[in-house]
Amino acid sequence: MLENFVKVADMPQEVIEKYKDQVPAELVQIWQEDGLGTFLDGYLKVINPDDYLELLQDSYFRGDVAFPMFVTAFGDVITWEENAYVGIVQYNIQDLDIMIKRMDRFIEYVDDEDFKDDYFDIPLYKKAVARYGQLAYDECFGFVPLLALGAFKDVEHMDKLKTLEHIYLMYQLTGGVMDD
């Protein structure tokens, strides 16, 4: 279903069964046809929601109505929220954004240049890949030190980090993404 998808594993069948009635049909189709892996040249990863759900609920003020679907190369979590729209939780800058209503529209526009410019930092990602190499499935690029602690948003101040651990660290040091 996703173009240029690089599969790393099947989505566990028990996960599909557990969530199939709570998520959009398109996501279930991705899980069944594509599984776990990367797309958009490695920028986005299809994740096992069980790995991120508790973290999202604890670290995001809308975590009770958000479901983790994807994670970006910078540790942002793409969510399905209120059974209606796709959002992005940006732990690096303690912010969130509503990307688009309806999952089918997200899939349609995810590779659109304007959409990518609005929500993803593809140029910085390409520079990071050129300098540090491709990410492993469980890695993201993280800023060192964290942006909240004074790092500059450039490739000289980043490194490859384990995605889940990095998001937990950002949450612990910044308090997560809360409604101010």
Whereabouts are the PLM-identified features?
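Arginine residue identity/basic-tract feature
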Residues: 62, 102-105, 131
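Serine/threonine-rich low-complexity intrinsically disordered regions
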Residues: 7, 12, 24, 92-95, ...
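A surface-exposed partner-binding patch
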Residues: 1-88, 141-180
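Compact, glycine/acidic-enriched structural inserts
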Residues: 87-124
